[in-house]
Amino acid sequence: KQTAYPVCGQGFTLTAALPAPVDGWEVGAYGIRTPVLARAETLPPETLDLVLAPCTAFDEAGRRVGMGKGYYDRFLPRCARAAVYGIAYEAQKVDAAAAGPLDVRLDGIITERGIYTWK
């Protein structure tokens, strides 16, 4: 198994990247370390087994709310065989997340209190 990391690109694209072993990281948006895409190996979304998606909110129906740019909304439908789990704090749980009709339902959420699963 390998661990790929998300790289946000122009046009609100998201790429799964394996960082190069030497000088493979840079500081990206929001001060977050991200793989240097020019030196990374990229993985096609359809080959991924598991995707961890950040959430600003989630509900018990498996709906997630992201940051509003749609990176994961465009990426997740291409991850047909992957289990998709959100990453959030328990305090981000809401009664009904404002997800849109194109949003991909999560298989579960991982919080500091445990793992919720729905599918």
Residue ranges of predicted features:
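Extended, well-folded interaction surfaces typified by the phenylalanyl-tRNA synthetase beta subunit core
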Residues: K1-T42, Y89-A96
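Surface-exposed, charge/polar-rich loops and edge strands
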Residues: V27, V36-A38, E46-V51, D59-R64, ...
